[in-house]
Amino acid sequence: MDPQNQHGSGSSLVVIQQPALDNRQRLDYEREIQPAAILSLDQIKAIRGSNEYTEGPSVVKRPAPRTAPRQEKHERTHEIIPINVNNNYEHRPTSHLGHAGLSNNTRGPILSRSTSTGSAASSGSNSSASSEQGLLGRSPPTRPIPGHRSERAIRTQPKQLIVDDLKGSLKEDLTQHKFICEQCGKCKCGECTAPRTLPSCLACNRQCLCSAESMVEYGTCMCLVKGIFYHCSNDDEGDSYSDNPCSCSQSQCCSRYLCMGAMSLFLPCLLCYPPAKGCLKLCRGCYDWIHRPGCRCKNSNTVYCKLESCPSRGLGKPS
């Protein structure tokens, strides 16, 4: 019984071991076959198609909501990019063909489809770029023409405006000067009868007043006398003393003149102040006589209103 049991057990072992080996081999084969089924061409096509679909229209949709000047910038970039893309697509088929010979036959049509879609996209971009180049090529010569016209208009306009302003000012002057003197025939308004002062200007970055009065004061050192009287006098009377140190109508006239006489020993230029002041008054009178357009009569109280409708009417006495 022992040898039979041994043979039986041996035969049963053989029967049990062979299926085990077959199952392992089948599992190995199934594992090898399953990755091929997972990495199918349909799945690869779906991934490629989704990527190409997202990359293609997104470039076209971006410049749509933007403003006009920004679209011009993108148009210029599209003009440069398709040339490089075409060159890449022209060189890519050779590289893909080389890889296709080495790789499996299943990947060949996938690469050919991608290149075909890329060439279609490049052809569409080329057509859009060529149309944009035509538009851009025509636009530059039209832009400088209105620019030159505007510059010419700006150069010619100020002359016309100046003439209009002068005419308007003359009309306003004619309407303002209505009251005229009966004796001299000149206007008696406040602007025309006001005395004219000597011209002055600001120097040293508009910090110093340059006028005839200031030249006389600084030339004769009278500014030092005004400064001393301002600091030595009281607060209530300092303004009057410093402004008019040579006035005879104010109080303490003798003390002020004695002080200026003592200062003239050290500053002899103070002696030139009285004649310089007289020359200044004479210059003021001459300038006022020449440039004052209004009436100078003192006792002419009779005036009449100028009639705009009758400008050539003679002067008549008021009723």
From Swiss-Prot:
Output a single Gene Ontology CC term carried by this record: cytosol
What is the superkingdom listed in this entry's lineage? Eukaryota
Biological process (GO), any one: animal organ development
Residue ranges for the region (Disordered) are 54-157
Q: Which Pfam families match?
A: Sprouty
Cytoplasm among keywords: yes
Xref: InterPro entries: Sprouty, Sprouty_domain
| Listed Low complexity bias regions | 112-131
Specify the SPR domain's residue ranges. 183-295
The annotated topology with respect to the bilayer is: Peripheral membrane protein
Q: Where in the cell is it found?
A: Cytoplasm; Membrane
N-acetylmethionine modifications at: 1
Q: Which UniProt keywords apply?
A: Acetylation, Cytoplasm, Developmental protein, Membrane
User: Bias category Basic and acidic residues: which stretches?
Assistant: 69-79
Q: What the record says about its domains? A: The Cys-rich domain is responsible for the localization of the protein to the membrane ruffles.
**Could you give the subunit structure recorded for this chain?**
Forms heterodimers with SPRY2. Interacts with TESK1. Interacts with CAV1 (via C-terminus).
Record family assignment: Belongs to the sprouty family.
Function according to Swiss-Prot or TrEMBL: Inhibits fibroblast growth factor (FGF)-induced retinal lens fiber differentiation, probably by inhibiting FGF-mediated phosphorylation of ERK1/2. Inhibits TGFB-induced epithelial-to-mesenchymal transition in lens epithelial cells.
What is the recorded name of this protein?
Protein sprouty homolog 1
Q: Which organism is it from?
A: Bos taurus (Bovine)
